[in-house]
Amino acid sequence: MKGLFLRIITALALLFWAIDMVFPWQFLRHTEENHYTAIQARGSLYVGTINNQISYFINKDSERGFEYELAKAFADTLGVELEMKIFDNQEQLFDELDKHNIDLAAAHLLYHPKNAERFQIGPAYHSASWQLAYRKNENRPKNLGNVKKDIYISNNLALEETLKELQKQYPQLTWKRNQALTQEELLLQLAEGKIPYVIANSIDIAAIQQIKPELAIAFDITDEANVHWYLPNSPYRDLQTALLNFMNNAEETGLLDNLKEKYLGHISQFDYVDTRSYMNAIENTLPQFSPLFEKYKGELDWRLLAAVAYQESHWNPDATSPTGVRGIMMLTKNTAQHMKISDRTDPEQSIKAGSEYLHWLISQLPESIEKEERIWFALVAYNIGLGHLIDARRLTQNLGGNPDNWLNVKKNLPLLAEKRYYSQLKYGYARGYEAYQYVENIRRYMNSIVNYHRVQENQTTNDNANNESAVKNLEEIKENKD
């Protein structure tokens, strides 16, 4: 009897040991499957991001941005809808990721060992560094040891860890972490001279410089680091595997390159004098012509039409070139006759004709070119003629590229000026390098208008919120006194 009792106790112990060994694995596996299934069941992928001109923004009531488009493509591969969750800073974003309130964090987030310990990371898809920004015409510090005034950073604990390491080399280094303002808002305050220094992501600084040329870069405080999406730190292997496969495919198909070209390609070019002149023109000259650009935009974004006009004439209705093109859209006599206008120096006639001519050029393009890219091809034709655009597409195909892909054709435009290439083309020599720069300038000018107005609207919204808060506080004070 005693032996039977011992055998039962031993068997139960072994059973409990087996459950203890197996159950956690079963639980984790169940949790993993539940999470991935939950995304499918709810029919939505929750992606957290930060509202700025690169990652995510609203344009004409539509969601836009590098991270938005990439996340939308990922959601499509999962067969679910995308729901973006917007946060002010990285710590808010990571806190929600920690709580599993979002499935992914995507906001051009740099790699940091602390974050890698806290979360799982997706494949690298870009790179950036942390830079010290200061206001142009102020003294430029050579290193952190020369910084004598306050350095501001947004709410980013990983960046603080980096600064603590640098503090060992520069003991006098101090900084202020602002939890109320976004990184973009800090950079805007720096541009206005309200604060002396900001440490920010190199991508965000380059983007803001396009509308705030007063911003200048003192130096990089870190080497370039990879940019990743982050996932919650639990066994999300199905989602992580799907993300890995998606990113590999995005690299192979050119999706990543196309998004980098669309959202980051223009910010690498920065000229202080040109940008300062342009921003002055946006503030002082554009308002008198913007109603006409909106009136005659047709299927185009009016801000693109405005950007073309600035590239052509700097919004000068009386502009005339040595070759005889005239007006705010710089039309030739032949184009004016084709578009049936009588006075090229009349802004309304010129803008109407320029828009109609661009629409006509777009209609001449093959349907195989994606809708979103057709305008860039049309602008090349606007600049150097439809024949030379045909040559550029043919040359791209001959060189093994895709003649319907703007990124492929764009890089071959300068070859139209090289004899070994143009001698084999139907329409011969063309200043393709000028057409290349022409389109790049227009894209940059258009994005600057979009982001100038976006920043203005955000500031107005914030001012209104502050005013409402102040009024509420006064009312509460009055009630307390009564």
From Swiss-Prot:
Enzyme class: lyase
InterPro entries: Lysozyme-like_dom_sf, MltF, Solute-binding_3/MltF_N, Transglyc_AS, Transglycosylase_SLT_dom_1
Location(s), subcellular: Cell outer membrane
Keyword field: Cell outer membrane, Cell wall biogenesis/degradation, Lyase, Membrane, Signal
An annotated Gene Ontology molecular function: peptidoglycan lytic transglycosylase activity
Residue stretches of biased makeup (Basic and acidic residues): 473-482
Cited CDD domains: MLTF-like (cd13403), PBP2_YfhD_N (cd01009)
Entry protein name: Membrane-bound lytic murein transglycosylase F
Region (LT domain): 268-482
Keyword Amino-acid biosynthesis: no
Membrane topology label: Peripheral membrane protein
Example of a GO biological process term: cell wall organization
Protein family per UniProt: In the N-terminal section; belongs to the bacterial solute-binding protein 3 family. In the C-terminal section; belongs to the transglycosylase Slt family.
Tree of life domain: Bacteria
Signal peptide bounds: 1-18
Function: Murein-degrading enzyme that degrades murein glycan strands and insoluble, high-molecular weight murein sacculi, with the concomitant formation of a 1,6-anhydromuramoyl product. Lytic transglycosylases (LTs) play an integral role in the metabolism of the peptidoglycan (PG) sacculus. Their lytic action creates space within the PG sacculus to allow for its expansion as well as for the insertion of various structures such as secretion systems and flagella.
Reaction equations catalysed: Exolytic cleavage of the (1->4)-beta-glycosidic linkage between N-acetylmuramic acid (MurNAc) and N-acetylglucosamine (GlcNAc) residues in peptidoglycan, from either the reducing or the non-reducing ends of the peptidoglycan chains, with concomitant formation of a 1,6-anhydrobond in the MurNAc residue
Main location: membrane
Encoding gene (name): mltF
Active site residues per record: 312
